[in-house]
Regions:
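Soluble or luminal CAZymes and related metallo-dependent hydrolases
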Residues: 26, 47, 54-58, 97, ...
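A structural motif corresponding to the C-terminal end of an alpha-helix
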Residues: 65-69
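PLP-dependent enzyme catalytic core of the Aspartate aminotransferase-like
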Residues: 28, 103-112, 116-153
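Conserved glycine-rich beta-strand-loop-beta hairpin in the small C-terminal domain of fold type I
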Residues: 48-63, 73-92, 118
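Conserved core segment of the aminotransferase class I/II
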Residues: 1-53
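Short beta-strand-to-loop capping motifs
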Residues: 91-95, 129-131
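Non-transmembrane alpha-helical segments in soluble domains
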Residues: 35-38, 63, 90, 102, ...
């Protein structure tokens, strides 16, 4: 956190960088709603962890599918710590820039955001776990199998 944001602790970065960026210019009612959610989480009356675990399960399954078909995970560590599975993860394919990969995957019905649009210097894509449904994993595997067959030298 110190290298990336100039702050040393999670709390400092979270309050002064993340929360400020998310809530500055936001209406009072939205800020109060967010504060209420944080309060219930802190009080233990809202188990937010169980609410977000599904994204981790999806990411774990999606990462396996992508890596089984020749992709690699771009960001798998933050400094020396492994990155947990969650809402987003990053992928790359050998010999392709993020833009090339994004364009090519569209032909296979797979969409993601190029890492270059997020300010990253790494080549690859940012994939989101939020919209995939259980019945779509097999379809994704079929599409990535075709992708690999068509992109293997």
């Amino acid at each position: 956190l110190t290298q990336r944001y100039g702050g040393g602790t999670f709390g400092t970065v979270y309050i002064h960088r993340v929360l400020y960026a998310l809530s500055s210019g936001t209406s009072h009612s939205a800020q109060f709603a967010l504060a209420a959610m944080f309060k219930t989480a802190a009080d233990g009356t809202f188990d937010f962890i169980s609410e977000v675990k599904e994204y981790g399960r999806r990411a774990e399954r999606l990462k396996k599918i992508f890596t089984d078909y020749g992709f690699r995970i771009v960001y798998d560590h933050d400094l020396d710590e492994p990155i947990a599975d969650g809402f987003y993860f990053t992928i790359a394919y050998p010999g392709m820039t993020g833009g090339e990969l994004m364009e090519e995957l569209i032909y296979y019905g797979v969409c993601a955001i190029s890492l270059s649009t997020t300010g990253s210097n790494q080549e690859g894509l940012l994939a989101c776990t939020s919209f995939i449904k259980p019945h779509q994993y097999a379809l994704l595997e079929e599409r990535l199998k075709l992708f690999k067959e068509n992109h293997t030298a």
